[in-house]
């Protein structure tokens, strides 16, 4: 059995980006480890969700542990950096934020966290962090540096994977969602889709820093058998994701269409014309 480490930026990223893969690997008997760079202090909490004097970072720490339990994660660890906020947020300049961290120093922290693990695969984001988030980009840099150092030290077996979004598949899902919205409106039904969320995603899809085209993606992991656990893990993040959110309100069949496959890249093995692999551990 393998040890697969998922390195994420904030609590909830693990559930949204890779929760299905984590649950599937755990069910198959592999050791799944989650490392989180920050505690998500700069997130925007759902109104009224925090208790008196409850710090958002503390709440999100508890939420990621709950999510990890649902997904079958064997261990959760934090690097100890502060959330950097979104692009151009003033929090980007905070001296303790992950974005400001020296990459070598952060790599040493990651190495300390993983010193007791025999890592077979490390999962980070693609080179632009999925959608350009500073902390996601930094995860890519630090995780890549860690793997490079391991290889230089003689570990030829450790593998790197990028979790990403399939730009083409997401466009198809959005087109289908819009068709369903129009149908529901035409017959007077209440549509589950969130117009604002769809518009945000459409704007992001127009950017070259959002996900990757299907032709560059080497792994498409079918997670339909564990989608219930993925959705429960998402639901654990109550400070960030309300019950009426896009992620939780959609019918099961729509959720399966949108999230039934999770996408990865093996940066050492360009896809070319090869079919996508359904096994994250295979080169």
Locations of the language-model features?
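Metal-dependent de-N-acetylase/amidase catalytic core
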Residues: 1-3, 92, 100-283
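Active-site rim/loop-helix segments in enzyme catalytic domains that contact anionic ligands
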Residues: 1-118, 144-153, 265, 273
């Amino acid at each position: 059995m393998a040890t697969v480490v998922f390195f994420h930026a904030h609590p909830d990223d693990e559930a949204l980006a890779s929760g299905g893969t984590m649950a599937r690997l755990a069910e198959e008997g592999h050791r799944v480890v989650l490392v989180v760079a920050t505690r998500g202090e700069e997130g925007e909490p759902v109104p009224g969700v925090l208790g008196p004097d409850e710090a958002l970072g503390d709440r999100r720490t508890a939420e990621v542990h709950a999510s990890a339990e649902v997904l079958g994660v064997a261990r959760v660890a934090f690097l100890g950096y502060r959330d950097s906020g979104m692009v151009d947020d003033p929090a980007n300049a905070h001296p303790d934020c992950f974005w400001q961290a020296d990459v070598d120093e952060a790599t040493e922290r990651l190495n300390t966290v993983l010193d007791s693990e025999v890592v077979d695969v490390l999962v980070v984001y693609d080179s632009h962090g999925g959608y350009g988030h500073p902390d996601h980009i930094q995860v890519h840099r630090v995780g890549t540096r860690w793997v490079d150092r391991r290889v230089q030290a003689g570990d030829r077996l450790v593998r790197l994977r990028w979790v990403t979004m399939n730009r083409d598949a997401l466009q198809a899902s959005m087109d289908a969602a819009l068709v369903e919205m129009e149908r529901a409106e035409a017959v007077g039904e209440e549509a589950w889709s969130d117009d604002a969320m769809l518009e945000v995603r459409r704007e992001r899809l127009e950017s070259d820093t959002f996900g990757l085209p299907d032709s560059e993606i080497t792994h498409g992991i079918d997670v339909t058998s564990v989608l219930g656990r993925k959705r429960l893990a998402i639901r654990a993040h109550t400070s960030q994701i309300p019950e009426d959110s896009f992620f939780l309100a959609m019918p099961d069949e729509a959720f399966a269409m949108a999230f039934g496959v999770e996408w990865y890249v093996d940066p050492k093995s360009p896809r070319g014309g090869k079919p996508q692999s359904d096994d994250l551990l295979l080169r």
